[in-house]
Structure formats: C-alpha cells, structure tokens
Amino acid sequence: MPYEIKKVFASLPQVERGVSKILGGDPKGDNFLYTNGKCVILRNIDNPAVADIYTEHAHQVVVAKYAPSGFYIASGDISGKLRIWDTTQKEHILKYEYQPFAGKIKDIAWTEDSKRIAVVGEGREKFGAVFLWDTGSSVGEITGHNKVINSVDIKQNRPYRLATGSDDNCAAFFEGPPFKFKFTIGDHSRFVNCVRFSPDGNRFATASADGQIFIYDGKTGEKVCALGGSKAHDGGIYAISWSPDSTHLLSASGDKTSKIWDVNVNSVVSTFPMGSNVLDQQLGCLWQKDHLLSISLSGYINYLDKNNPSKPLRVIKGHSKSIQCLTVHKNGGKSYIYSGSHDGHINYWDSETGENDSFSGKGHTNQVSRMTVDESGQLVSCSMDDTVRYTNLTLRDYSGQGVVKLDVQPKCVAVGPGGYTVVVCIGQIVLLKDQKKCFSIDNPGYEPEVVAVHPGGDTVAVGGSDGNVRVYSILGATLKDEGKLLEAKGPVTDLAYSHDGAFLAVCDASKVVTVFSVADGYSENNVFYGHHAKIVCLAWSPDNEHFASGGMDMMVYVWTLSDPETKVKIQDAHRLHHVSSLAWLDEHTLVTTSHDASVKEWTITY
C-alpha cells in the first residue's frame, strides 16, 4: 500500500449556544462519541489522540449512541435519517437505515437487549418514534408533547419504562413495550433539556433550563425529590449523567459550572467552576467508569478532577470549525503542526503525540487564510481581519507587537530570507521588510490570488485569477515586474517553489498542476493530470522529487516530478469535505487538513 493513515487528530464537537450537546458513552468503557458537521467522531477515552471518524451521513449529524451490546452505533441527522452501523470493523458497514420522521433527530435511546430504539426530535407530524432495530416495526407511540422533544431515555432493565423531555416544559412517562403514554410530568417551568434513567433503573432524573433537577422513581414515575432544593444551578442545565453505581449524578450548566450530586442524601459533593467567559458554559457531560467529561461552549472537552474541582485533569482542544490552512515547523527537536480555522483560531499540535493547545492572548478575529514560518522562527499568518501577524513560536503568545494592519483584505502570504514578507491582497501586492510595509503595487492590472518566494530570496511568483503567473524581483525595498508571464491551465489556486529552488509548481481551477523549470527561464517542465475537481493546495516534499496536491474532489495526489504517471492517490482523504491545506513533516509523512476540522497524518511510501 503506497499510503497509510498514521494519525487522526479529530475535530471538537460542534456546539451551539443554548443547545445541549450529547456525549455518547461506550458500554465497554473504551471510547466516547460526539458529532461535528456530517461526521461522527469516536475517541479513545484514555488517549483521545486515538480517533476514528465516521462520514456516511449526507446531512449534519446531531447525535450518536452505542447500542448496549457495543457492536453497533445509531446516529441521527437533521433530515431525520437514522443510520445503524458496525463498530467492530474499520469500514463501519451500514446495518440498517430508517427515517422515523422528517426533521431533526435530537436524541436516541436503546433498550438493554439492543433490540429496540427510541428516537425523538423535531419532526413535522410527530416528535418521536420507537421501533425494532432490525425491521423498523413500531413498538409503541411517543405522544403527550406538543413541542419538539429534546431528550429520551429507556430504563435498562425490565419492566421497561421510557421517559422524554420537551420544549413544552414537560417530561412524559411511558410503559411498554409496546410503549404507551402514561402521564405528563409538569414540575419544570422551562424547557426540559435532558432525561436520564440510572443504570440500575431505580430512578430517573430530569434537567431543565429553569436550573432545576428532579429525581423520580424509575418504575412508577413518582417524584422523589428536587436536587439542591429550589435551584440546582444558577443557569439552565443542559445535560446530566449518572455514575456507574447509580448513586451520584453529574450535571452541566450554562452557569459555567458542572456539579456532582449525591442523590441518596440530596447534596452537592463537588462543584467544578469552569471559568468566567461565556465560552465556559457547560453544554454536555458524560460519566464513564472513572472518567468525568464535560463540553464547554468553546467546544473544548474537559476531564474533570474529583480531587481538585478547580482545575480539570486535562482539556482536549482543537478545532470545531473548518480548517483553512496549516504549516509545520521543527522546534526543539520536535515537529509541530500549526493549523488555522475560519473562526480565527490557531492551534498547534505535537506531530507525534497529538498533544495540542491554542496560542495565548488575543489573536485573529476572522478567518486565518494562510500561514507560514519565517527564518527567525515566527509564525506569519494573514487573516480576513485585514492583518498580518508575526507570532513567536517559542513563546506561542500573541503580543500586541508583530501586527501589521493592511488597507485591504489579504489572501495569501509568503516569506523569504532577509526579513521579507510578500502579501497578496484583493487587488494589491504588498512587500514588508522587518514587519513594516515598504512597498505596494496597488493596481497590478489583474487579480492576484497566491504568492511564493524563491528560496534564494530575490524572486517572487504571483498567481492570478487570469490563469497567469507573474515573476517579480525584490530589489531593496521594491518589487520589480520582470515581464515574465507563465501560463497555467486555468485560474491559479496555489503555487510553490521546490526547496532547492529548481522548480515552481502551479495548480489551478482547471484540475491541472504545471511545473516550470526555474533554471531554464521558467520553461514548462511537465504537466500533471488526475484530479476530478478544482485543485486547492499543493506542497513540495523535502526530497524535491515529489509534491502533493489536494482538491475539491476530496483527493490527495502525491506526484513524482520526473514521471507524471508514477503517483500515489489518496481517495477520500477527508470524505465529504475538500482538502484545504497540505504540508510535509518529512519525506514520507504528509499532513492534510480539511473543512471537517480534523488534521490527518499519512505515511507515503514510493
């Protein structure tokens, strides 16, 4: 096999303010699940750097839950499609697909024998359904609510009971199978966000936007108590999760705290303050074995520490929005990956362990369009907030210095030796030296899109939307047009010089990569065909003999310079999402990013 996936650094959960986010637990205790966009992400709970991504939904996925057997996962999307798929094989073969109702699926529950499934949400004609997993035959009706149902759970032993919570401020109680509506529970005064039965089935809890948690008898549905008296939290409660022994309950709230409750004596055991920023609101939680997890509005996943509630054991960071660009850099003998997303967030990853964090301080306020590292070890990034930033990679701190404000929005940035930076903006090319503007070409007569600086430092290539590449010379503090026009096969989308400066590779919207030989006066060396859609990005391998290209067709090709027929094709590198950026860690390791907000490392063998 010429390529192999080496590592997957998965995206964070996709979160929305005021909406609870479900973390699905694994009955075997190894993994946990959540969703982002059209992906379901499975991560190892002990080592979250180990991840797997399921991408077979055509629409945004909202919730995914393991069957109690652990062999299947059911996932539901905004169109009302429920897919049940295999967890034991890498291919995740589809077992069954159902459409219980037309509209967003918000929660899923299985019976303990993994044979029946309840699905609730925002259907047009009904808000829930309960059916056999293998035939889809109905095993009851979910009625009793007049608004969208947010949550459902089923008692995990016989006699079965089912509970739901809805935006009509009520919970409902059902007996079955076949499941029949018994009564409505109207104790809450706001939306009911979450209902959960304890693992032993003796009790169930409801949590609401009114800040209250009520405990009920699991068999009869009678009220037992209100946790914490009149208020369990100062804000709305979005999620609850029982401890494996059914004695304690974990709750997550918009008041930016999570709490552990001793249900038997009705008291708070610990409170976890998660911060003071609005992004620290807690939208989801999971108690699995010894792990207590919560999700913040920032998308970060917190591992809570019972022994030290004020500080999480670890926080999983990353991206929850699409990644636009990446670059790599060696620092202190380690290779790091830097990725920038369309919300202005820049993250750095240890390429071996997947340990990652974001830069401290206030950075870009809009999409990061392009990043590169200059000779002094600074990350140079340009963003739709009309700035170019220079960030020290040893400190990884956005300082007030190192920000260059531009007149128009930058699209691409490239650096050369001697402190030079060239920025391509809308209708403008800007030359910076030592972080200061020294020259600009204001009306170049074409629309510049991308830029590359020759490793020698004296030549700049600018690709335009007119399908041409123009060559400029850096002379002191000016840029001089050399009058050279290199023709690509379509609007130029990216270009790069090989590390030895011998070749310039240009990719375009017409699905072609053209390589020019620099020493021969930029004569055309070779043309590379293979992509089925617009090529977005390219990167040279350190060996100067291979280069990779990624496109809207979700494919990555690794090309051999001397022979266009010798190529490695990575199909569906990021399934359902186009490849947004590429970089090489070494001659055999390629890093790709995509709008699925994940980073992948591939081992390439020739």
Curated annotation (Swiss-Prot):
Any GO CC annotation of this UniProt entry: cell-cell junction
Localization per Swiss-Prot or TrEMBL: Cytoplasm, Cytoskeleton; Cell projection, Podosome
GO molecular function: actin filament binding
CDD domains xref list: WD40 (cd00200)
SMART domains: WD40
Entries under InterPro entries matching the protein: G-protein_beta_WD-40_rep (IPR020472), N2O_reductase_N (IPR011045), WD40/YVTN_repeat-like_dom_sf (IPR015943), WD40_repeat_CS (IPR019775), WD40_repeat_dom_sf (IPR036322), WD40_rpt (IPR001680)
UniProt repeat feature WD, residue ranges: 4-45, 48-87, 93-135, 138-176, 180-218, 224-263, 270-306, 311-351, 358-408, 432-474, 480-518, 523-561, 566-604
Protein task: Induces disassembly of actin filaments in conjunction with ADF/cofilin family proteins. Enhances cofilin-mediated actin severing. Involved in cytokinesis. Involved in chemotactic cell migration by restricting lamellipodial membrane protrusions. Involved in myocardium sarcomere organization. Required for cardiomyocyte growth and maintenance. Involved in megakaryocyte maturation and platelet shedding.
UniProt name for this protein: WD repeat-containing protein 1
Organism taxonomic ancestry: Eukaryota, Metazoa, Chordata, Craniata, Vertebrata
